[in-house]
């Protein structure tokens, strides 16, 4: 019995088979690793890759394209270079280096790629923003006019920092630079300022200590720590500050206030130099690449006070689409970069670069630190280019005489070492200066509210402490402020609310201080 095959049956079977056949083809742009080592990989074949784009290497190692050359791409690796070998396939990710942002990041310790490293589980952040972004143009900015209180008397009185300012903290190692930054973070409690602490090239133990300090003083709830430790690859250390700026910009552009601390940019410059030399970029002064100034300027220019006009703010240059619906005006991003000097040499390459970019510097000196003056701020070299605009009126009023008195004291102190016979006026100026220096001393992690600062500096500049023995000044200050808080809280709250020191309040404060000091001297007779 023969079976006949009908052509129409065959064609209908084929049609059914073809209808059920689905071809799934994923198209990837791939390249091949030509050479790898020291955290750098040279990749052949990625002809359409963008500068700053993330690349996927085998074994879950991520990289970033930095050098786009004629025949290959120079990429930096964010993982161990031993995990990547010659001939490996590299995939383009199609996305530029970015980081998750949002309130979910607060209270967490993350690496510069936004991955949590504190063991508290994954972060539920809906939004991702690119690490690199152009700074807001002039039209979208507003001049700095609100104070960002650090809680340190010497800074808030003489080197005030405003919201949206860039103020450099510079000094040798072990002079208390990080302590100043941490005090500033602790002082933002309840002030609606979100803080980002970027640790670049620090020891893991140091970062753990910083985190435990922030936890101890209830400051971690409004702070994010971005950590690139000394053992992390150089590329991670170099991108860490940009991650901090991006996170701060999210708060700034949504109409809130943020403070970002870069600790420290000297180590970032060193890691950038390492990456650049490995990528065979031509070296310049001190072997840094020619664009090391641009590295820091494009980072620090992102700190700004944004205009109050929402419509103008929404047109901000380089604003990511995902962020546009959330934009509000009036936000600010304040930057406190830290630079470590060698033997007090402020005129080295990186320190001079960053000094010229920032709106002032707080210079910490090891001699002052070792002599017991802490914070060890050299008031002569330190400056804030925003000045009185970043102070409340009461502080502005009394701080002018403070700076002058201290300058005269330093000058006379140098001369007094040569001769012992001093006239009455000179001796009085020296005595007052010594007491003012004593007033400006402050313990670590005890930031002082601005109204208390105003009260004690007013008492000092009025000469009311001149008759108090120098060794009792700190004790007198503590007891006086405690007494004010207990019996005359209205004066302190008045200064805090109005921001001014009216003539009647000033005379009342003077009377209270005079009576208190008289009884204090009686009580503490030697």
From Swiss-Prot:
The record marks 382 as: Required for activity. This is ATP synthase subunit alpha. Belongs to the ATPase alpha/beta chains family. ATP binds at residues 171-178. InterPro entries: ATP_synth_asu-like_sf, ATP_synth_asu_C, ATP_synth_asu_C_sf, ATP_synth_F1_a_nt-bd_dom, ATP_synth_F1_asu, ATPase_a/bsu_AS, ATPase_F1/V1/A1_a/bsu_N, ATPase_F1/V1/A1_a/bsu_N_sf. Its main location: membrane. It is found in: Cell inner membrane. GO terms for cellular component: plasma membrane; proton-transporting ATP synthase complex. Keywords: ATP synthesis, ATP-binding, Cell inner membrane, Cell membrane, CF(1), Hydrogen ion transport, Ion transport, Membrane, Nucleotide-binding, Translocase, Transport. It catalyses: ATP + H2O + 4 H(+)(in) = ADP + phosphate + 5 H(+)(out). Its EC number is 7.1.2.2. F-type ATPases have 2 components, CF(1) - the catalytic core - and CF(0) - the membrane proton channel. CF(1) has five subunits: alpha(3), beta(3), gamma(1), delta(1), epsilon(1). CF(0) has four main subunits: a(1), b(1), b'(1) and c(9-12). Produces ATP from ADP in the presence of a proton gradient across the membrane. The alpha chain is a regulatory subunit. GO terms for molecular function: ADP binding; ATP binding; proton-transporting ATP synthase activity, rotational mechanism. CDD domains: ATP-synt_F1_alpha_C, ATP-synt_F1_alpha_N, F1-ATPase_alpha_CD. It comes from Chlorobium chlorochromatii (strain CaD3). It is a peripheral membrane protein.
């Amino acid at each position: 019995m023969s079976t006949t095959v009908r052509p129409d049956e065959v064609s209908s079977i084929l049609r059914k088979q073809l209808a059920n056949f689905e071809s799934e083809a994923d198209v990837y742009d791939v390249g091949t690793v030509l050479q790898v080592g020291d955290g750098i990989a040279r990749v052949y074949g990625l002809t359409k890759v963008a500068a700053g784009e993330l690349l996927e290497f085998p074994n879950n190692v991520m990289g970033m394209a930095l050098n786009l050359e004629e025949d290959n791409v120079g990429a930096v690796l964010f993982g161990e270079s031993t995990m990547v070998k010659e001939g490996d396939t590299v995939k383009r990710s199609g996305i530029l280096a970015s980081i998750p942002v949002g309130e979910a990041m607060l209270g967490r310790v993350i690496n510069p790629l936004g991955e949590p490293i504190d063991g508290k589980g994954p972060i539920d952040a809906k939004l991702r923003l690119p690490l690199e972004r152009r700074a807001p143009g002039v039209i979208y900015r507003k001049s700095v006019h609100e104070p960002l209180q650090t809680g340190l008397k010497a800074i808030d009185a003489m080197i005030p920092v405003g919201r949206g300012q860039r103020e450099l903290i510079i000094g040798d190692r072990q002079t208390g630079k990080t302590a100043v930054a941490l005090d500033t973070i602790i002082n933002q409690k309840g002030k609606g300022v979100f803080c980002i602490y970027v640790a670049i090239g620090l020891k893991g133990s140091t970062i753990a200590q910083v985190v435990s300090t922030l936890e101890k003083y209830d400051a971690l709830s409004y702070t994010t720590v971005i950590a690139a430790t000394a053992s992390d690859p150089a590329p991670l250390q170099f991108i860490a500050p940009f991650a901090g700026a991006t996170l701060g910009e999210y708060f700034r552009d949504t109409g809130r206030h943020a403070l970002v601390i870069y600790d420290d940019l000297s180590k970032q410059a060193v890691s950038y130099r390492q990456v650049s030399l490995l990528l065979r970029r031509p070296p310049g002064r001190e072997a840094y690449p020619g664009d090391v100034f641009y590295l820091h300027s494009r980072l620090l220019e992102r700190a700004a006070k944004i205009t109050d006009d929402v419509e103008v703010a929404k047109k901000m240059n380089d604003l990511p689409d995902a962020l546009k619906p959330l934009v509000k005006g009036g936000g600010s991003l304040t930057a406190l970069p830290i630079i470590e000097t060698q033997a007090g040499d402020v005129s080295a390459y990186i320190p001079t670069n960053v000094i010229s970019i920032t709106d002032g510097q707080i210079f910490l000196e090891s001699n002052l630190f070792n002599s017991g003056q802490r914070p060890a701020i050299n008031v002569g070299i330190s400056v804030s280019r925003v000045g009185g605009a970043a102070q409340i009126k009461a502080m502005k009023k009394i701080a002018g005489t403070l700076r002058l008195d201290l300058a005269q004291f330093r000058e006379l102190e140098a001369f007094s070492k040569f001769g012992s016979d001093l006239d009455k006026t000179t001796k009085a100026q020296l005595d007052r200066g010594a007491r003012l220096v004593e007033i400006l001393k402050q313990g670590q992690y005890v930031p002082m509210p601005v109204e208390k600062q105003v009260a004690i500096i007013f008492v000092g500049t009025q000469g009311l402490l001149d008759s108090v023995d120098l060794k009792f000044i700190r004790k007198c200050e503590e007891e006086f402020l405690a007494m004010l808080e207990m019996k005359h809280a209205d004066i302190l709250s008045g200064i805090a609310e109005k921001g001014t020191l009216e003539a009647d309040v000033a005379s009342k404060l003077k009377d209270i201080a005079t009576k208190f000091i008289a009884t204090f001297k009686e009580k503490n007779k030697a």
